[in-house]
Amino acid sequence: MKKPIMWVAALLTASCTPALKVEVANTTPTERDDETVEIAWSEVAALKGVTPDNIVVLNDDNEQIPSQVLFRGGTEPQALIFQTDADPMESKRFKLVTGQRENYPAEAFGRTVPERYDDYAWENNKVAYRLYG
């Protein structure tokens, strides 16, 4: 059973402004770090001229934050994700706009282990895994 950790409301105001406004609320009494926020691409597509290559997420200070478009194995975008921290009972606002996306350093790494053609290893800043074939 999934517990609702973060609540997301996309305020579809694209027809009024060149941005979509998103409010993310932590409705729990627990601090949330690096919580992933997912917005269906069908909601993002309400933004005029948006493509997977030009969607940008801005915080309240108009600073661009890393985001990623999910395709889930297909050729059409399915969702937009980004991460944020949230204190207990805190709400944050973000804007989705079109623009030039910044390049961000990779935070995860994966590779096929050359010593064994059927092994795979991957890691990020919190965990590391190795799959033995």
Model segments located where?
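Sec-dependent signal peptide recognition
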Residues: 2-8
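Alpha-mannosidase-like glycoside hydrolase catalytic domains involved in N-glycan trimming
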Residues: 17-112, 117-119
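Hydrophobic h-region of N-terminal signal peptides that target proteins for export
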Residues: 9-17
